[in-house]
Regions:
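His/acidic metal-ligating clusters that form di-metal
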Residues: 3, 12-106, 179
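Hydrophobic residues embedded in beta-strands of well-ordered beta-sheets
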Residues: 1, 143-144, 252
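Short acidic, gly/pro-rich beta-turn/loop elements at beta-sheet edges
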Residues: 13-15, 53, 116, 147, ...
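Conserved beta-sheet core of the metallophosphoesterase superfamily
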Residues: 60-168, 202-204, 221-223
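Active-site/binding-pocket entry motifs
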Residues: 9-11, 112-113
Length: 261
């Protein structure tokens, strides 16, 4: 069952606020009253319902978007009785998957146009380092699967980027002679598995709230932002993973596995 909501309220002069108004929520409640609770739901709207705020005690922290706090909670309460519900959102031009409840997952999508409406050789990724691309949903009956695909790449080559922090300049997050490894897993959600081995031995992996080194480098080098110095800065993201090898020249294998295996 598919639903489209409008949670942008125009205020004039290119200003707006985030709001799912009461009329839409009342309509949605009536609409879903006619839908079997075992039917998967896909609810789309522009602005995310939730966002990540960091990591505390090794666990990702989330919050509702401030200006639509109350109406988001009403929306969640309406969706809770269903076996499976997906909220599809955009707006921020970055990738986030947030497990709101055991049965409600928000997918906040990166953009095929990366960080702006123009796609060119310097705008190939978003502010969290996700390659410009789009989400593909495969739906068969009541079964839903999804994966991320970068523009111009196969799905297999669209999932992560790994950094040898020995070789990354310090101003972009590098750490010379540390043997540290940073992995950006673009479409991560809490049911993914991240594995890094050194010469066949598993290394401990830690989730970080961190910026993407390559995006910081690209933004620093391009001249296209000189007249807008605060726009599209690198942001901390939840899908960064860190480990440390024992040697600089050992064989490192990074493997990421989504919830579908």
């Amino acid at each position: 069952h598919y639903v489209m909501l409008d949670n942008i309220v125009g205020l004039g002069n290119c200003k707006y606020k985030y709001l799912i108004n009461s009329a839409q929520l009342a309509w949605l409640k009536k609409d879903l009253a006619l839908v079997d609770k075992s039917t998967p739901l896909i609810v789309s709207m522009h602005v995310p319902a939730y966002t990540y705020t960091g990591i505390s005690d090794g666990k990702p922290m989330t919050k509702k978007r401030n200006t639509q706090y109350q109406d988001v909670q009403v929306l969640i309460n309406i969706l809770k009785p269903f076996k499976e519900a997906h909220i599809l959102t955009g707006h921020d031009h970055r990738n986030r998957n947030i497990q709101i409840t055991h049965n409600i997952l928000e997918h906040n999508f990166a953009s095929a146009s990366a960080i702006s409406w123009k796609l060119n050789d310097v705008r190939i990724m978003t502010t969290d380092g996700t390659l410009s691309g789009y989400q593909i949903f495969d739906i068969s009956g009541k079964q839903i699967q999804w994966h991320y695909k970068a523009v111009g790449l196969t799905p297999e080559k669209s999932q992560f980027r790994a950094y040898d922090l020995n070789t990354v300049p310090e101003k972009y997050g590098g750490n010379p002679a540390s043997n540290e490894i940073l992995v950006n897993v673009f479409n991560w959600d809490p049911r993914w598995k991240i594995s890094v081995t050194e010469d066949g031995q598993e290394l401990p992996v830690e989730q970080l709230w961190e910026k993407d080194p390559l995006y910081m480098y690209i933004r620093d080098k391009t001249q296209r932002f000189n007249n807008r110095p605060k726009d599209w800065r690198a942001v901390n993201c939840i899908h960064m993973f860190h480990t440390k090898a024992t040697e600089a020249n050992s064989e490192i294998v990074v493997s990421v596995t989504d919830r579908f295996g």
